[in-house]
Amino acid sequence: MDAKVVAVLALVLAALCISDGKPVSLSYRCPCRFFESHIARANVKHLKILNTPNCALQIVARLKNNNRQVCIDPKLKWIQEYLEKALNKRLKM
């Protein structure tokens, strides 16, 4: 084999070994790209507040009827009230 071919193959193999297989664009993507704005408070089983440095406030809800997870619009009135109540409760501790 030619030395140039061997060198190129070695570089390609080294690049493949170094890579973790995940594209950079996926590692910084926000979990909630779309928000549901018609979710009633009574249909929510559990809320999870995601705090990531690169994304705005994100709230994920698990629904009661089908156990599905959806991203809820943080501007909903009942979400704002819930967050305010939770913050006040935490400040009193």
From Swiss-Prot:
Q: Quote the cellular component terms of the Gene Ontology held in the record.
A: external side of plasma membrane; extracellular space
Task: Kindly indicate whether the keyword Transmembrane belongs to this entry.
Answer: no
Per the record, which residues fall in region Receptor binding?
A: 39-41, 48-50, 60-70
According to UniProt, residues marked as the site described as Important for integrin interaction and activation are 45, 48, 64
Cysteines paired by S-S bonds: 30-55, 32-71
Instruction: Report whether Secreted shows up as a keyword of the record.
Output: yes
- Gene Ontology MF term list: chemokine activity; chemokine receptor binding; growth factor activity; integrin binding
Q: Keywords on this record?
A: Chemotaxis, Cytokine, Disulfide bond, Growth factor, Secreted, Signal
Main localisation:
secreted
Task: Describe how expression is induced or repressed.
Answer: Down-regulated by 12-O-tetradecanoylphorbol 13-acetate (TPA), with 5-fold decrease in expression levels at 1 hour after TPA treatment, 12-fold decrease at 4 hours, undetectable levels after 8 hours and low-level expression returning at 24 hours after treatment. Down-regulated by serum stimulation, with expression levels reaching their minimum at 4 hours after stimulation and returning back to normal levels at 16 hours after stimulation.
| Tissue specificity note | Highest expression levels detected in kidney, liver, spleen and muscle. Isoform Alpha is expressed ubiquitously but at varying levels, while isoform Beta displays tissue-specific expression, with expression detected in kidney, liver, heart, spleen and muscle but not in lung, colon, brain, skin and stomach.
- Signal peptide (UniProt feature, chain positions): 1-21
Q: Site annotated as Important for dimer formation: where?
A: 46
Question: What does gene deletion cause?
Answer: Half of the embryos die by 18.5 dpc, and neonates die within an hour. Mutants display defective B-lymphopoiesis, defective myelopoiesis in the bone marrow but not in the liver, and defective formation of the heart ventricular septum.
Q: Where is this region: Receptor and heparin binding?
A: 29-33
Which InterPro entries is this protein grouped with? Chemokine_b/g/d, Chemokine_IL8-like_dom, CXC_Chemokine_domain, Interleukin_8-like_sf
Q: Which GO terms describe its biological process?
A: ameboidal-type cell migration; blood vessel endothelial cell migration; brain development; branching involved in blood vessel morphogenesis; cell-cell adhesion; defense response; dopaminergic neuron differentiation; germ cell development
Q: Which residues bind heparin?
A: 41-51, 62, 69, 85
Subcellular location as annotated: Secreted
Query: What positions carry the motif Receptor activation motif?
Result: 22-23
What role is this protein assigned? Chemoattractant active on T-lymphocytes and monocytes but not neutrophils. Activates the C-X-C chemokine receptor CXCR4 to induce a rapid and transient rise in the level of intracellular calcium ions and chemotaxis. Also binds to atypical chemokine receptor ACKR3, which activates the beta-arrestin pathway and acts as a scavenger receptor for SDF-1. Binds to the allosteric site (site 2) of integrins and activates integrins ITGAV:ITGB3, ITGA4:ITGB1 and ITGA5:ITGB1 in a CXCR4-independent manner.
Subunit structure and binding partners? Monomer or homodimer; in equilibrium. Dimer formation is induced by non acidic pH and the presence of multivalent anions, and by binding to CXCR4 or heparin. Monomeric form is required for full chemotactic activity and resistance to ischemia/reperfusion injury, whereas the dimeric form acts as a partial agonist of CXCR4, stimulating Ca2+ mobilization but with no chemotactic activity and instead acts as a selective antagonist that blocks chemotaxis induced by the monomeric form. Interacts with the N-terminus of ACKR3. Interacts with integrin subunit ITGB3 (via the allosteric site (site 2)).
In which family does this protein belong, per the annotation? Answer: Belongs to the intercrine alpha (chemokine CxC) family.
Q: What is this protein called?
A: Stromal cell-derived factor 1
Q: Which gene encodes it?
A: Cxcl12
